[in-house]
Amino acid sequence: MRVRVAARGSRLSLLQVEQALEELSRYAGVSMHWEVVRVKSAGDVWSDRPLESIGVVGVFTREVDRAVASGAADIAVHSLKDMPTSGYGGPLKIVYIASRPSARDALISRQGPGRVEDLEPGSTLGTSSARRRALSLHYNPRIRVENLRGNLDTRLRKLREGLYDAIIASEAGLIRLGVDVEYTPLDPSYFPPAPGQGFVAVVARVGSNVEKMLRDLDKPPWWHVAWAERGVLEGARAGCRTPVAAYAEPLGRSMVRVTAAALSPDGSRAYWARAEGRIEEARRIGVSLGEELSRVVEGWHKTGGGS
């Protein structure tokens, strides 16, 4: 089967295409040959601006999805964490989610191994993620967190040049890129990741050959885990412009545990919620936790502590 794959042109994006399509071929039992249609996203065009200032829903996905919707590509491949919760009920649909090598964040520091609270007072930590910023300030309010955009190679170069004392990156990205650098993995129970972090999603048009081929196949075991984390984002969406984190893990074959967190942007307030249930109910559990986060954040706003 030949497919045209819309994706961003970064080295990590192309590696994710390769992983997702090779895994999808095995899953569906179909030999797939692909041609990459490279697309520049809004996030790529405005690479010098903080993500929250761009003001675009799906800053890394919108233009890529348009290539599929217009027929210029058959499927799109995204980092699941970059995908908004709306827009995939038709005409576009998430048809497959590739497994993740890790959900964890990684702290890379010029000061050596350690957790965020071990960074020296006045240290400068670079990140473009509102979640990583809030969590870092929650654990260590004595550091400075500054915006840092760019691919992983660029961020590591700026760290080596001394522009930052530490950065936080996705461990999955480090693994996929084969980066040889010393880092401290941050346990998800302590530093929960972005919902869907590490997973790679495949999007297709409803009714397309790819969507029909995958429609009735059993879902891979990590499918429900991924949807539990997205469920947190769905549930929190209505009242939450606040940083949200989520981590789901299977408990044996039939159960799942979901951890969710919301923080004020400055890290001064944080709320954790956890729940367990049957794995088929994973998405519902995630949505319920997200709604709980939303209610808590609404209370912060009423008392002037959510900003």
UniProtKB/Swiss-Prot annotation:
InterPro entries: HemC, Porphobilin_deaminase_cofac_BS, Porphobilin_deaminase_N, Porphobilinogen_deaminase_C, Porphobilinogen_deaminase_C_sf
Keywords assigned by UniProt, alphabetized: Porphyrin biosynthesis, Transferase
Leading EC class: transferase
One GO term (biological process): protoporphyrinogen IX biosynthetic process
Catalytic activity, reaction form: 4 porphobilinogen + H2O = hydroxymethylbilane + 4 NH4(+)
Pathway: Porphyrin-containing compound metabolism; protoporphyrin-IX biosynthesis; coproporphyrinogen-III from 5-aminolevulinate: step 2/4
Family affiliation: Belongs to the HMBS family.
Purpose of the protein: Tetrapolymerization of the monopyrrole PBG into the hydroxymethylbilane pre-uroporphyrinogen in several discrete steps.
Note: The porphobilinogen subunits are added to the dipyrromethane group.
Name of this chain's protein: Probable porphobilinogen deaminase
